[in-house]
């Protein structure tokens, strides 16, 4: 005999199902469930008097020797990923996602994809949202607190460069030379996050860059503050092609070594990741945004200019002066800073993101951006664009799935593809490391509930440890057991070049973390950017007005006075 529940009651018990939508935070974005792997009436729910008990939803006989038995089940999760928005149980074993579907006891339940046994832990995610851990490709390694601040907004992987608050690191995302690369690899070995380091891409000989890749750098960064010259770019790209590592560039704002067209020529059709492609963070003034229309260029943004608000322009000038070691008493330094801040290109940047012409969102952490705001700014921008541009094609009332999948890809799968780590992380897919972020829908985009690294709870909202329950105040994000001891080494990854990996860099310098090589970075095009592969035929920036035109049509938007996911979430 069946038991009937109305839709609202079912959602309260088991989470949304097909036909339901979930509002994301206080935005006007709604995620509609596209598929539900649940068998109604046989949901795997944990708790007193519930299903996941011995001999019911939990197998009474299967041991962990059975590879179908998982270490952790995340039950009833609403998964938001570039691959889709679905409702499913997630099975984790040995730190990786081994199944997405339906978990339980095959002796008592139908259509079970993986087994819950005596060795299985349960995380109840009914009514909660699960995303892949965020990846920030543009981090200045200035403060050792960056990983924790990133985790506070769901960032689990950091790529960038630096050695601490040295002036070179304050300005550029480069870790220069074997000594610094070695020491920084050792420094982050006990930090609960994934890391990759970018070499300094300068010089008229390839050897000066090659030695850094051999030392363990996972990519190369050419930056104007060290000189973004034709020779430096060309030689860095030669090394990137030889060793299969990513190449990123912060181009020449002053146009001293050449103009945008000269830099484009230096690329020679090779794959390039352009940082802050709008230009306020740096790059050819005023027309770096032209790069967003090139097939061989993978363009990213930094979060200080996203979304475009009434206060955005005001803070940018001071940021540039401090970040790039400029002197307000020198008129030329002030002119340099002013040349980079253009409200017209900032306005166009929002729209290009919404079109899918800008593929990646990053922070530029501590050097004009905030590592703890990558995810939040991404969803604020999506919300602003829905309000100003309306639904994307294929979206409808209470269904913004196309826009949601486009924006989640900007800080998960696309940065993973760009830096050659998509085989390991970047999406909620079977076979990848279980770097997962669990959100309450009301807090989505602002404050995670739990963060898993390599299948282990590492950060999360936790109450007073001296209380009788985990819920009493103050409930704040705190480190959990995965952030301590040898667990850090077993659940986090250091990414290096294939050369360094093959030549035993882990043993050579005494690393304890998982060490993995980056790969498949050199034959990428804009078409490889998931749901963000639009390459306009022509992008033109008027040199006098700085207005942006795509195929001769003006591209702009208005600044907003208030954003979603802002003050009501951060009272202090």
Swiss-Prot record:
Binds 2 nickel ions per subunit. Its EC number is 3.5.1.5. Residues 133-572 form the Urease domain. InterPro entries: Amidohydro-rel, Metal-dep_hydrolase_composite, Metal_Hydrolase, Urease_alpha_N_dom, Urease_alpha_subunit, Urease_AS, Urease_asu, Urease_asu_c. The keyword Cytoplasm applies. Ni(2+) 1 binds at residues 138, 140, 221, 364. PROSITE patterns: UREASE_1 (PS01120), UREASE_2 (PS00145), UREASE_3 (PS51368). Heterotrimer of UreA (gamma), UreB (beta) and UreC (alpha) subunits. Three heterotrimers associate to form the active enzyme. This is Urease subunit alpha. The gene is ureC.
């Amino acid at each position: 005999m069946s038991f009937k529940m109305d839709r609202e009651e079912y959602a309260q018990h088991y989470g949304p199902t097909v036909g339901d939508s979930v509002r994301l935070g206080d935005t006007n974005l709604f995620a509609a469930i596209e598929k539900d792997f649940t068998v109604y009436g046989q949901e795997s729910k944990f708790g007193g008097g519930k299903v996941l008990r011995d001999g019911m939803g939990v197998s009474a006989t299967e041991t962990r020797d059975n590879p179908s038995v998982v270490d952790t089940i995340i039950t009833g999760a609403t998964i938001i990923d570039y691959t889709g928005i679905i409702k499913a149980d997630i099975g984790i074993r040995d730190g990786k996602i081994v199944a997405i579907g339906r978990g339980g006891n095959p002796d008592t339940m139908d259509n079970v994809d993986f087994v819950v046994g005596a060795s299985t832990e349960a995380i109840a995610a009914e009514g909660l949202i699960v995303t892949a851990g965020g990846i920030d490709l543009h981090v200045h390694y200035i403060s050792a607190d960056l990983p924790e601040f990133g985790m506070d907004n769901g960032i689990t992987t950091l790529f960038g460069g630096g050695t601490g608050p040295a002036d070179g690191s304050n300005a550029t995302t480069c870790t220069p030379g074997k000594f610094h690369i070695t020491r920084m690899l050792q420094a982050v070995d006990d930090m609960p996050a994934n890391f990759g380091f970018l070499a300094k891409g300068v010089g008229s000989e390839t050897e000066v860059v090659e030695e850094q890749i051999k030392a363990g750098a996972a990519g190369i960064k050419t930056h104007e503050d060290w000189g973004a010259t034709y020779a430096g770019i060309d030689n860095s790209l030669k090394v990137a092609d030889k060793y299969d590592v990513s190449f990123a560039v912060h181009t020449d704002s002053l146009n001293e070594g050449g103009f945008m067209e000269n830099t484009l020529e230096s690329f020679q059709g090779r794959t390039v990741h352009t940082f802050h492609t709008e230009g306020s963070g740096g790059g050819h003034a005023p027309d770096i945004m032209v790069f967003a229309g090139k097939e061989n260029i993978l363009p990213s943004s930094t979060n200080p200019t996203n979304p475009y608000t009434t206060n955005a322009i005001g803070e940018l000038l001071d940021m540039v002066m401090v970040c790039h070691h400029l002197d307000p008493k020198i008129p030329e330094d002030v002119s340099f800073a002013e040349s980079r801040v253009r409200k017209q290109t900032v306005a166009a940047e929002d729209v290009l993101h919404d079109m899918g012409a800008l593929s990646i969102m990053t922070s530029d952490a501590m050097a004009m951006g905030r590592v703890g705001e990558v995810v939040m700014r991404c969803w604020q921008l999506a919300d602003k664009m829905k309000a100003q541009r309306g639904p994307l094609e294929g979206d409808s009332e209470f269904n913004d799935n196309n826009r949601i999948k486009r924006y989640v890809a900007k800080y998960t799968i696309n940065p993973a593809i760009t830096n050659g780590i998509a085989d390991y992380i970047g999406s909620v897919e079977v076979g990848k490391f279980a770097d997962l972020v669990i959100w309450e829908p009301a807090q989505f985009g602002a404050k995670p509930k739990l963060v898993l690294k390599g299948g282990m709870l590492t950060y999360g909202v936790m109450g007073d440890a001296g209380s009788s329950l985990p819920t009493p105040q103050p409930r704040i994000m705190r480190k959990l057991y995965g952030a301590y001891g040898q667990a850090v080494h077993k659940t986090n990854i250091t990414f290096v070049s294939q050369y360094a990996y093959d030549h035993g860099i882990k043993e050579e310098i005494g690393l304890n973390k998982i060490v993995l090589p980056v790969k498949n970075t050199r034959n990428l095009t804009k078409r490889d950017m998931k749901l963000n592969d639009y390459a306009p035929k022509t992008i033109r920036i008027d040199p006098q007005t700085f207005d942006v035109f795509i195929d001769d049509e003006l591209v702009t938007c208005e600044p907003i006075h208030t954003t979603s996911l802002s003050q009501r979430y951060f009272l202090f």
